């Protein structure tokens, strides 16, 4: 993608996230209001508040996303499937599922595939597989992307943000590995307009960040002429 112009609208790329386990209902309400005000693509919240967020959003444009087994991905497949089904019943429209890296590194990629495929089949909503890509070697990353595609996921998310952030190089690598068959969701450490723009230029179609309003305000401030 060509370099973004200074007036490019990043809002439709942003998944406005609040994944602090101590966040209050008031903070989550504010997050939903901000997502609606700025016309963000989605909000991403913990499962316990999905039902309330559905009521707050009440048919507004931001999609409602939640995480499954965040941030470790180490629960049993059965518990993940149950959590995914419950989240959808409560109103989640997209699910960000942390994959089980332990199975992958134990030469049981088949179980990683089976788990994701079961979640895809059981829910019927877009599934984004969180790869924790910065922890994988090139061979592991290629194997994981292949099985995610075969399992039917809609998008690949670079990481939880707990083990390094997204980079343009990583986004480009994932695009090459997937041959653009699914979207790339960049997440982790995205705090500035320049960072966000570079990731979109690299090919990301979704940006997971809790700094969405600040990112847009930075660009607005930079483009506002100084008083004479």
Curated annotation (Swiss-Prot):
Biological processes per GO annotation: 2-deoxyribose 1-phosphate catabolic process; carbohydrate catabolic process; deoxyribonucleotide catabolic process
InterPro entries documented for this protein: Aldolase_TIM, DeoC, DeoC/FbaB/LacD_aldolase, DeoC_typeI
Swiss-Prot/TrEMBL keywords: Cytoplasm, Lyase, Schiff base
Pathway linked to the protein: Carbohydrate degradation; 2-deoxy-D-ribose 1-phosphate degradation; D-glyceraldehyde 3-phosphate and acetaldehyde from 2-deoxy-alpha-D-ribose 1-phosphate: step 2/2
Main subcellular location: cytoplasm
The keyword Heme is assigned to this record: no
Reactions performed catalytically: 2-deoxy-D-ribose 5-phosphate = D-glyceraldehyde 3-phosphate + acetaldehyde
Protein name: Deoxyribose-phosphate aldolase
Record organism: Synechococcus sp. (strain ATCC 27144 / PCC 6301 / SAUG 1402/1)
